[in-house]
Amino acid sequence: MFPIKSGLEPKRKQELLEFQKQAGLKFKDLRLLDLAFHHRSFSNEHNNFHANNERLEFLGDSVLGLVAASYLYKSFEDRPEGELAKIKASAVSEDALSKTASKLNISNYLVLGRGEEMSGGREKKAILADALEAVIGAYYIDSGFKAAQKFVLRLLESTIHSVLEKKFISDYKSLLQELVQKKFKTVPKYELKKASGPDHDRTFWFSVSINGKVYGPLSGKTKKEAEQSVAKVAYENLCSESTVSK
């Protein structure tokens, strides 16, 4: 099950115990938690391509989504599906998750490759958000759904209320898609225009095409970030056009 060495160094074990105490977790097997902090840049540099948190992140993303959707469904009976989807998208967005990861000091426990470390990987939103999802996935495997659900709800409740109070920027890709479908009966088409930089410090440029009009390209340190940036510009432009035409 574990693609990394089975034993934990005393210093690393102490670090993991410190994290789970302040995060309110209790792992039966700390190796799972350790794996959740291993970024692919480290495994790639050490020629062990499976010793990273990507599979745990995949699982944690699904657990997070289910818990968030279930909580919203039960807690906001008067809200329509579209509004619940917007709240969920914002609450589990990379921006929101990275903020939560920062509160948990996840950056202190990450295991990164040398190049990623030198490029400031510990502070990158995508890496922090992915690591948090990996921790959720690891806790689900270790302690079951109910324990993972309890942990996620503890993280999510304040975030969801912040979303409702408009403290978080919405998921512009979701907002744009809904607006475009309603206005033009089609969907936005994103296109990667350019990618540059080494693997550990890439920059991506995306444009979005809507009903024959192209917005962008705009850049981001991840594909998601670049898509969100250009979606925000397109959404705000379309909203302005709608206001002017009224």
From Swiss-Prot:
Domain RNase III: 16-144
Highest taxon of the lineage: Bacteria
GO molecular function, one term: metal ion binding
Residues at which Mg(2+) binds: E57, D130, E133
One cellular component (GO) term of this entry: cytoplasm
GO biological process terms held by the UniProt record: mRNA processing; regulation of gene expression; rRNA processing; tRNA processing
Substrates-to-products reaction catalysed: Endonucleolytic cleavage to 5'-phosphomonoester
EC supergroup of this enzyme: hydrolase
Cofactor: Mg(2+)
Compartments, record wording: Cytoplasm
Active-site residue numbers: D61, E133
Pfam families cross-referenced by the UniProt entry: dsrm, Ribonucleas_3_3
Key words, A-Z: Cytoplasm, Endonuclease, Hydrolase, Magnesium, Metal-binding, mRNA processing, Nuclease, RNA-binding, rRNA processing, rRNA-binding, tRNA processing
The DRBM domain, residue ranges: 171-240
Matches recorded under InterPro entries: dsRBD_dom, RNase_III, RNase_III_dom, RNase_III_sf
Gene3D superfamilies: 3.30.160.20, Ribonuclease III domain
Enzyme nomenclature, EC number: 3.1.26.3
PANTHER family given in the database record: RIBONUCLEASE 3, RIBONUCLEASE III
The protein's role, per its UniProt record: Digests double-stranded RNA. Involved in the processing of primary rRNA transcript to yield the immediate precursors to the large and small rRNAs (23S and 16S). Processes some mRNAs, and tRNAs when they are encoded in the rRNA operon. Processes pre-crRNA and tracrRNA of type II CRISPR loci if present in the organism.
Quaternary structure, from the entry: Homodimer.
Similarity comment: family membership: Belongs to the ribonuclease III family.
The protein, known as: Ribonuclease 3
Organism encoding this protein: Treponema denticola (strain ATCC 35405 / DSM 14222 / CIP 103919 / JCM 8153 / KCTC 15104)
Gene this chain is encoded by: rnc
